[in-house]
Amino acid sequence: MSRIVGIDLGTTNSLVAYMAGDFPRVIPDADGRVLLPSVVAFTPDGILVGETAKRQLVRHPAQTIYSVKRFMGRGYEDVKAELRYFPFRLEPSQEIVRIQVGDRAVTPPEVSALILKALKERAEAHLGEPVTKAVITVPAYFNDSQRQATKDAGRLAGLEVLRIVNEPTAASLAYGLHRLKRGTVAVYDLGGGTFDISILKVQDGIFEVLATSGNTHLGGDDFDRALVDWFLADVLARHGVDLGRDPEAMQELRLAAEAAKCRLSFDERTVLTIPFPQHGLTYRREIARAELEALIDPLVAETLGPCRLALADARLQAAQIDEVVLVGGSTRIPLVRRRVQELFGKVPHSQLNPDEVVALGAAVQAHILAGGITDMLLLDVTPLSLGIETLGGVMSVLIPRNTTIPTSAKEMFTTSADGQTVVDMHVLQGERELARDNRSLARFELRGIDPMAAGMPRIAVTFLVDANGILQVQAKELRTGKAASVEVKPSYGLTDAEVERMVEESFAHAEEDVTSRLLIEARNEADTVIRATERALGQGRHLIDGDEAERIGGALATLLGVRDGNDRDAIRGATERLNQATLHLAEALMDAALKEALASKPVTEVLEKTES
Amino acid sequence: MSIKADYFEVFGLARKLEIDPEELQRRFYEMSRRVHPDFFQTGTPGEQAGSLERSALVNRAYRTLRDLVSRVEYLIQLEEGRETKEGAAGIKPEAPGDLLAEMLEVQEALQGAKADGLDEAARERVKAEHARLLERRAVEEDGLRVLAREWDGVGDGDGNREALLERMKRVLAARAYLNTVINDLGEALGGEAQNHVSHRRH
């Protein structure tokens, strides 16, 4: 399997890491910098990403997008309140957020894709080989739409996203390689825009998340804003000038506030000097750490509620936590450390660089997926309850929050009118009683139901949350045994067709030969299935009879025969037929694996024997 | 064992209610190591789908069996041959009439106290009531443990099985009523660790 990189797609900065031998390593750019500012500038001369884009913030605020992660998977209504802090304009819309840059509108996944593409290129330059597969991290408290948006961004960047992994749990993997071997761990992750708390049990290489909670709109950005508001009031009082209406001045203030906040983590006092020649003034101000702390204390306090909730959900007392790990740049702030220490009653750890640890953990997870690590396994949970809207606008929970994923739930549906062939479902995520108070994820249409009298069809719908925390829906009418097709209309996301179209457009822009690219993709997929089939046969030949082995052998030979040809449809057809031929073998192998698990001796027992 | 196995079969356990939590966790980890999708990234599409499905089954089974209350609920569902928890009406027969009346009284008192603005004295009363009901629930759960042991002792053809199932159902119903009131009291006290979801599920 080709190399899989780990990417931390952050609100403020993004990083890419890979496994170098036994330990993960972050990849620097040509100048040796590992942090890529998550900023994208749309200039008349082209698109800039990272450090160069950041320099455009003050000069071209309306065309320079930062903190786009706050908009991922969100609707206009969700973010309206904070728009006054952003210099760029959003198109009011009921659906996905669209950001206006010049004469075009871009969606958050498209902007994130540009950041991912820059990281992909950085990794390719460093490793000297193409990089097409990645594990990308998201806040643990991200809902389905936000995860899906991140996955879409990966696809738009030309990356196959093999796994969406939660940031705090990724961090725990990085720590796990070094020192965390056993015990209960709380990972407190306060980044630029999001906050997560995850409680894990670590034992024998298994990282089992017991509970998670958080706030996807709380982080360093909010501290900066508190500081900016304070500066604005101060400038108004002392100079009689309202800088709040000047986008360029606002950017200057925001960047100065961010820098001052960072300095105050190490110094007791700091001085700001910002010239505003266009307003005929120079703003000079000394600020003490205590003043900053007074401003942000209420925000830091907001992180403690989710911590207590996660502890309660994990059925643990704070005193039962063995270790507390700090992740995210905002955990450098002394006040944050103090509050965490007070809550858990112990000194938190931060041996690994809090900016890098998530990307390092993503690289570890990537290595697990590639088969490079077999003794570590992360068992994560779904952060929010998932349900459907039922009569009277009430949410009926199908999968409660903090359920270990993958997981599934089955629900029966029927029709309410004679001859009805389509059934609607509204899928929600959240903890509130009423449907309208929860997050609308998508509307699903079950189509192709045979016309029958009302109430006759018995449609079994399976809601499956995969290891990415992303929902898949399958439906089957039990009387006819027919699968119903499921049409998804995401509430705040791109449809598959839209993503497909954007991918094709990006090919066109890159002036690539779409046909040859698609042919290569088909061959790669064929190779994957060929290798997997050969391995499956090697492991499970004894589980199937001669006829079946012959059928698989035949399908394998056919695919090998067309693999080097130029007929993409023939390759795809033969790949699909080989897949079908191996379905039963796969099932048999999986069941054998479960049986083996039951027959295996307890690890401790085995260890005792080898020791004696 | 196949995807159709019940949760006890998944872990190779007899249909008994006393389960050693450490052994259950050991088997859960062991099975996760064998079927988790992480280890089938390079597998055939059939293996990937199969691992996803079995991993979901193992996770559901562990979640259900690790906790006594959900274990008993599941056992009743199995014994009654129901496909899903949907028919959970079966698990909610009448709670004992006196408990029902008592809970209504507590609820009314709470409403009254809230209407009067919940002063310090009233808060203290609510707090005491909350603590009393938590204790009461613990007693019910102890009772459930006793019944569970009894269940494990009776043989297959034993006429006591039906009666035991009924008694367990009554304890579950009582517990569900207690939970509703405990949550209401907790909410009135402004406890942060309120579980909006779980109290609705009972």
List each model region and its residues.
Chain B
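C-terminal accessory/regulatory regions appended to core domains
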Residues: M1-H202
